[in-house]
UniProtKB/Swiss-Prot annotation:
GO molecular function: snoRNA binding; telomerase RNA binding
InterPro entries in the record: H/ACA_rnp_Nop10, H/ACA_rnp_Nop10_sf
Cellular compartments annotated: Nucleus, Nucleolus
Protein name: H/ACA ribonucleoprotein complex subunit 3
Family: Belongs to the NOP10 family.
Subunit (UniProt): Component of the box H/ACA small nucleolar ribonucleoprotein (H/ACA snoRNP) complex consisting of Nop60B, Gar1, NPH2 and Nop10, and associated with H/ACA-type snoRNAs.
Annotated Pfam families: Nop10p (PF04135)
Gene source species: Drosophila melanogaster (Fruit fly)
Disruption outcome: RNAi-mediated knockdown in female germline cells results in a cyst differentiation defect that prevents progression from the 8-cell cyst stage and oocyte differentiation.
Gene from which this protein is expressed: Nop10
Length: 64
């Protein structure tokens, strides 16, 4: 089981262990992604994400 969260109507995080909320929306993982300082391909990964508009700064804010 992983700690998950959802954002309520006030914009606060509500933590849970469930994969979906009561109204069927998926919850988000509360754990950060794994990181390795020896990542050989980070430059290429960022280049591809920039090219296809997949960076979080290039996406609109999610509507909950």
């Amino acid at each position: 089981m992983y700690l998950m969260y959802t954002i309520n109507e006030n914009g606060d995080r509500v933590y849970t262990l469930k994969k979906r909320t009561e109204d069927g929306r998926p919850t988000l993982s509360a754990h950060p992604a794994r990181f390795s300082p020896e990542d050989k391909y980070s430059r290429q990964r960022l280049t591809i994400k920039k090219r296809f508009g997949l960076l979080l700064t290039q996406k609109p804010e999610p509507i909950y």
